């Protein structure tokens, strides 16, 4: 399978969750006497995560424009953030629908749930790094990029977790369940921070490859030119 075909859509994530959870009404109880999440509640939670991801793109783009104003990064930023957002979708699919990490409905199961801390590194592992380096034509910089990626997974998983838990309970069923009004905003900040850290890691890895790794900028630019999404970044690098 081509690397760019592993990025799930939100429709695919919802479809897999629907398939795995079924249409239970949320009447069963799980541990701590909580109600098992209904399909409707679970889909609301997915929509929270989706909204947080959409907002995070805008937040990260604005922040990076200010941070790297002296590098004239605007010409590559929109496409680069789009690629990074797709990479983060692999993480979201892994966590929410079990796409990469395992079967079932991901880390949350049927209940309220929370993401295990140890999942951060797994979610940002080899498949994720291979995908983004492949689509940008940056496989050559892998040794300077891969080790720094797992720690960034925590930003994405925190954001997903906050957005997910922003909806609690089904109306009329759980008297203690209510939506947290600022959860999506807080979640988007975490996800945006993840996007920013990936950009910084990528740019730093390119510099390290060309200096410590004694890589050739012209050769790297040609590799990026031949990739699905790296041509513009390669041209910018040569300026």
Predicted regions and their residues:
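Cationic, glycine-rich low-complexity segments
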Residues: 1-159, 216-219
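Charge-rich, low-complexity amphipathic helices
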Residues: 99, 106, 110, 167, ...
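Hydrophobic, membrane-inserting alpha-helical segments
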Residues: 132-135, 139, 181-227
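Short membrane-interface loop/juxtamembrane segments of multi-pass integral membrane proteins
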Residues: 163-189
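Long, low-complexity intrinsically disordered regions
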Residues: 226-239
């Amino acid at each position: 399978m081509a690397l760019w075909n592993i990025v799930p859509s939100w429709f695919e994530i919802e479809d897999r969750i629907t398939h795995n959870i079924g249409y239970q009404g949320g009447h069963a109880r799980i541990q701590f006497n909580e109600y098992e999440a209904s399909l409707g509640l679970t889909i609301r939670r997915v929509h929270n995560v989706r909204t947080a991801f959409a907002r995070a793109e805008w937040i990260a783009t604005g922040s990076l424009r200010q941070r790297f104003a002296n590098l004239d990064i605007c010409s590559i930023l929109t496409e680069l953030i789009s690629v990074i957002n797709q990479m983060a979708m692999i993480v979201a699919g892994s966590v929410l629908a079990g796409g990469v990490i395992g079967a079932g409905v991901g880390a949350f199961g049927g209940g309220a749930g929370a993401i295990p801390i140890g999942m951060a590194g797994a979610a940002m592992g080899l498949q994720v790094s291979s995908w983004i380096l492949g689509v940008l034509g940056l496989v050559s910089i892998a040794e300077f990029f891969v080790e720094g990626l797992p720690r960034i997974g925590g930003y994405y998983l925190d954001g997903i977790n906050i957005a997910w838990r922003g909806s609690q309970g089904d109306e009329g069923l759980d008297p203690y369940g209510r939506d947290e009004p600022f959860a999506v905003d807080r979640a988007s900040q975490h996800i945006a921070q993840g996007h920013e850290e990936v950009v910084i890691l990528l740019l730093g890895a390119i510099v390290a490859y060309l200096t410590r790794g004694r890589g050739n900028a012209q050769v790297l630019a040609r590799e990026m030119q031949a990739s699905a999404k790296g041509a513009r970044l390669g041209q910018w690098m040569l300026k």
